[in-house]
């Protein structure tokens, strides 16, 4: 059996860094959509949560509230929300719970094939849970960068 401890170490690192950054964000700041952006910080956080559940566990295994798809799926934006977004505290708690749950559910399955390969057009295809896990870490890092850009734009507009 292959040793995937490095993947779990990276997951711990990435999620830990993300949760630490979340403590610097206020509820007010989380809802600002600066000029030139379509989403806010709260959307990016919810999107990370929803996407990781969906990509690793599929629609049947997701633990996010059902209404999160209408709020945080690709192509959605806060301007279209029909209800108030979850608090940062709630999102942080869900991210912590997800971290534990995914490690428990996939600990010994990273070499297992996904039910169906996940294709990113001509950019590549994920075939295993391990490949998808690594992709979700890239995705989380990408949205961490988006949040940094949003915070910079918010600070510049003050």
Positions of predicted regions on the chain:
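Short, charged, low-complexity loops and linkers
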Residues: 1-7, 81-82
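Generic serine detector
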Residues: 5, 16, 87, 108, ...
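Short, contiguous alpha-helical
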Residues: 8-12, 19, 29-76, 117-158
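Short, small-residue-rich loop/turn micro-motifs
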Residues: 22, 72, 110
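A structural signal for well-ordered alpha-helices, especially hydrophobic packing surfaces
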Residues: 22, 52, 99-102, 106, ...
